[in-house]
From Swiss-Prot:
Pfam assignment, any one: FAM222A
Family: Belongs to the FAM222 family.
PANTHER family: PROTEIN FAM222A, PROTEIN FAM222A-RELATED
Domain of life: Eukaryota
Organism of this sequence: Mus musculus (Mouse)
Protein name: Protein FAM222A
Alphabetical list of InterPro entries matching this protein: FAM222 (IPR029340)
Length: 453
């Protein structure tokens, strides 16, 4: 059918090309051959042209007008006779469909900086259509090398938190600092703390007390019954004591005491003191003088003592300075209604080791101390052992008692770094017990940190 149509269409052209029969037949044949030569190049011709142009990508071939070169609209038009000009037949994205062409043209799409003279390289890429396309340096680098940019290789480097500064070597091995961290909110995470770990403190205490050549003075005075230095000024009888507080506290608790055991071995590291501390003592400079209004409900407080007892009513905190045996702030609620009991919140005895006159670590000087808190109310506290390494027969029991007393005094010190009544006035609703994981095989400490609610 097509052949018939072609035959019917061709003779008028031949007749127009040869209008007069007087012309030579050869001229008519040449005209007819030139008409048939306007065709698409064969695949063999395209391959030969591609091989010839591959060595010189920037060469320009000017074809005669009677030879039609396939353009972009003619490429990839049909596959096995089916029209694939639509986008749904193309396996490539829309922006890459226009860059499919002959092999020679695809190879010509390289950076012209490779053939440019030595000097400043040009980041110019010639596309299939012959247009110059400027590329970004990252694209040029990725295009030249098949590897990604070196800055993207390797794992991401996250900023490391600042490491805790090492305590000075002149201080004793066990150094503690304030663990009272006011939180801005319940849901916010804690900032990275530079405080020494409780594990490292206990480990150093254990190593210092269990060393075969350890000095007796290193472990003897871990807890000595003595009035607090917060009331009596610097104590000259404790040369190792780096925590001598002489600053005046607010009127609610002028004579706020430390525990019954002032701890010469537990020192306050200078690197971890708050901004309000001075070298001569504790200066509470940054704390507000006017407390916020107290909450109407009764206050739940947690005591740091190791024996159960009934707390005093909040009315005894009316500005009188008296000495108390433990660092618990449960009797400093300024004008809170009613009395409350804290017996169910008392922690278990430290390691459940009780110092009795029949034990190996008994010291008559560290007998039970009875301290008068108010008329008619007395609290009996078992004093921690004072001289625990003199004349030992069973060393393991004594080391256990030393660690127990040191942990107890450590908790007292943490509770008494800030005035308790200021803590309750600032924080309002009490304390939250934070259970530290099991420190040693025979220890389990509960450090109480005040938090906002």
């Amino acid at each position: 059918m097509l052949a018939c149509l072609q035959r019917t269409q061709n003779p008028p052209g031949q007749h127009l090309a040869c209008p007069s029969k007087s012309l030579d037949l050869r001229k008519c044949e040449s005209v007819a051959s030139s008409m048939h030569s306007s065709r698409y190049p064969s695949p063999a011709e395209l391959d030969a042209y591609a091989e010839k142009v591959a060595n010189s990508p920037l060469s320009i071939k000017i074809f005669p007008t009677n030879i039609r070169v396939p353009q972009h609209k003619h490429l990839s038009r049909t596959v096995n006779g089916y029209d694939t000009s639509g986008q749904r037949y193309s396996p490539y994205p829309q922006h890459t469909a226009g860059y499919q062409g002959l092999l020679a043209i695809v190879k010509a799409a390289v950076s012209s900086s490779a053939h440019a003279p030595a000097g400043h390289p040009k980041s110019v890429l010639k596309s299939v259509e012959g247009k110059r396309t400027k590329l970004s340096p990252a694209t040029v680098q990725v295009g030249i090398a098949p590897y990604p940019v070196p800055s993207t290789l390797g794992p991401l480097a996250y900023p490391k938190p600042p490491e805790a500064p090492a305590p000075p070597p002149s201080l004793p091995a066990a150094a503690t600092a304030t663990s009272v961290i006011p939180l801005p909110g319940r849901g916010l995470p804690l900032p990275p703390s530079n405080l020494p770990s409780i594990h490292s403190i206990l480990y150093q205490l254990n190593q210092q007390c269990q060393a075969p050549g350890a000095a007796p003075s290193a472990c003897q005075g871990v807890a000595v019954p003595h009035p607090s230095p917060a009331k009596h000024g610097p104590v000259p009888s404790f040369p190792n004591l780096a925590y001598s507080a002489t600053a005046g506290l607010p009127d609610c608790r002028k004579g706020t005491e430390l525990s019954q055991g002032a701890t010469p071995a537990l020192t306050l590291a200078g690197a971890t003191k708050p901004a309000g501390y001075a070298e001569g003592g504790l200066d509470y400079l940054l704390w507000p003088q006017k407390p916020p209004p107290p909450p109407p409900q009764p206050l739940r407080a947690y005591s740091s003592s190791t024996v159960a007892g009934k707390s005093q009513s909040p009315e005894i905190c009316g500005g009188r300075a008296f000495e108390r045996a433990n660092g618990s702030p449960h009797n400093c609620g300024m004008g809170l209604p009613g009395s409350f009991t804290v017996g169910q919140y008392f922690a278990a005895p430290w390691n459940s080791v009780l110092v009795t006159p029949t034990s190996d670590c008994y010291n008559p000087a560290a007998a039970a101390v009875v301290t008068e808190l108010a008329p008619g109310a007395a609290r009996e506290l078992a004093g921690p052992p004072g001289d625990v390494l003199s004349g030992l027969t069973s060393k393991s029991v004594c080391n256990t008692a030393v660690l127990s007393s040191s942990l107890q005094s450590l908790e007292y010190l943490i509770n008494d770094i800030r005035p308790p009544c200021i803590k309750e006035q600032m924080l309002g609703k009490g304390y939250e017990t934070v259970a530290v994981p099991r420190l040693l095989d025979h220890q389990h400490a509960h450090i109480r940190l005040p938090v906002y609610r």
